[in-house]
């Protein structure tokens, strides 16, 4: 398959890489239809984070399930899904407490995992044609079939939930005024989340 591969600071290339495979019964393979470029990807691209050459970027992904592992219970081939940026198991102590960004199962030697990001586990990113998603019942959010609202739904992978979480942590209540400093994509979603 084709994928965006990091070479060195300020250099990426579209290259042929190995197709992902089902490695565990709870995996799915997703044909990627959208993958956003995050500021975190730019940290690696610009050399501000020590990324190893060969990493495939992309932790804001959505697509259609092409293949399914034998233990997957809530998803089917053909389901349109978006994957949150962090990889989590859903059953460890941290996941059970809602701290999925600090999952202790998905990344040997470090709490927390993400697709296509340095030191965040073995998970290949989604700036590619296909992607393996582990613990798929937990890591795939099913969407309506079709291709309507593709750009809108892609925000569910990282940008919108990050902004929403900020508004939630601020304990915003109806009628309150809110100031957002740094109104880039995530800041705009925090402002929007304060309205809803």
Label each residue range with its predicted role:
Residues 1, 26, 175-176:
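Nucleotide donor/acceptor-binding cores
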Residues 11-19:
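Short glycine/threonine/proline-enriched tight-turn/helix- or strand-capping micro-motif at secondary-structure
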Residues 38, 84-151:
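Cysteine-cluster motifs in flexible loop/terminal segments that predominantly coordinate metals
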Residues 80, 142, 147-196:
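Mid-domain Rossmann-like dinucleotide-binding core that forms the NAD(H)/NADP(H) cofactor-binding site
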Residues 40-45:
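Cytochrome P450 core scaffold surrounding the K-helix E-X-X-R motif
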Residues 3-6:
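A short beta-strand micro-motif
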Residues 8-10, 24:
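Residue-level recognition of beta-strand termini and adjacent short loop/turns
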Residues 18-35, 46-96, 101, 123-124, ...:
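Glycine-rich beta-strand-centered segment in the early N-terminal region that forms part
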